[in-house]
Amino acid sequence: MKYFVVALALVAAFACIAESKPAESEHELAEVEEENELADLEDAVWLEHLADLSDLEEARGFFGNTWKKIKGKADKIMLKKAVKIMVKKEGISKEEAQAKVDAMSKKQIRLYLLKYYGKKLFKKRPKNCDQ
């Protein structure tokens, strides 16, 4: 369960990185520099550093591809987990459970797993959490 949560957190992190906005262009940085009349050397160095971030698009491409790979592996893990849960919960054979899972969409599989783990966590909650 811990590994599943960590994997989901990593997937969310890569999704945020892949969908992030591109860095400002050098032209926009020059406008900012003119508007603010930068006299402070540290600000000028900071703006130079931002101008050197033109490789950001390449990095986003890398993370986008990595995101797709991680998402594919997470989907495979969810399929296997759903089959295991169905075998254990419903007492059916692995082949029957696999057939049921194959008939489900990815969204239905995610909802099935969330429902299962939600009930499991609800049962484990402390008694003093009732309101």
Swiss-Prot record:
Where does the signal sequence lie? 1-20
Which protein are we looking at? M-zodatoxin-Lt8o
Please report which protein family the annotation says this sequence is part of: Belongs to the cationic peptide 06 (cytoinsectotoxin) family.
Tell me where it resides: Secreted
Q: Which organism is it from?
A: Lachesana tarabaevi
| Expression (tissue specificity) | Expressed by the venom gland.
> What are the annotated GO cellular component locations?
extracellular region
Any single biological process term in GO: killing of cells of another organism
Please report the propeptide residues according to the UniProt annotation.
21-60
Against InterPro entries, the record matches this protein to: Latarcin_precursor
- Please give one Pfam family short name: Latarcin
Relate the protein's function as given in its record.
Insecticidal, cytolytic and antimicrobial peptide. Forms voltage-dependent, ion-permeable channels in membranes. At high concentration causes cell membrane lysis.
Q: Which GO terms describe its molecular function?
A: toxin activity
What coarse category fits the chief subcellular location reported for this protein?
secreted
The organism's lineage is:
Eukaryota, Metazoa, Ecdysozoa, Arthropoda, Chelicerata
Q: What are the alphabetically sorted keywords of the record?
A: Antibiotic, Antimicrobial, Cytolysis, Hemolysis, Secreted, Signal, Toxin
Entry annotated with the keyword Secreted:
yes
